[in-house]
């Protein structure tokens, strides 16, 4: 079973929206949203059971979405992996994206070094 299917407990809607808010933030951190980023964002959100309409609502009003902490370390790491995947999909890693990803990592109670480790791992694939 996909870890994203298990990532959410009782407040699964809040967790989904929180994760998608973080994804949208990363996608927009460099000042533009590429087609590749949008397609991946829609795909990742659809895996969480969200429609484009919901993504757009979060994008238009991110302040309405509260941060919700995933319950397990594995779930938090999975979210960071999604963020890095989105950040690297356009092959243009912007320092603002990396900085924001590390801030989100800290908020998720995961050492920010993981962001560099995942980027390095992806570049070696």
Predicted regions and their residues:
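Small-residue-enriched hydrophobic alpha-helices in membranes
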Residues: 1-26, 32-125
């Amino acid at each position: 079973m996909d870890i994203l299917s298990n990532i959410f407990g009782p407040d699964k809607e809040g967790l989904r929206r929180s994760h998608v808010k973080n994804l949208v933030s990363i996608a927009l951190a460099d000042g533009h949203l590429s087609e590749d980023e949008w397609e991946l964002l829609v795909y990742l959100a659809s895996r969480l059971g969200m429609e484009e309409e919901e993504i757009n609502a979060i994008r238009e009003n991110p302040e309405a979405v509260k941060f919700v902490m995933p319950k397990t370390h594995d779930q938090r790491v999975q979210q960071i992996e999604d963020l890095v995947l989105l950040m690297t999909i356009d092959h243009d890693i912007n320092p603002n994206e990396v900085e924001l990803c590390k801030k989100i990592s800290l908020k998720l109670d995961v050492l920010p070094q993981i962001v560099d480790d995942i980027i390095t791992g992806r570049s070696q694939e």
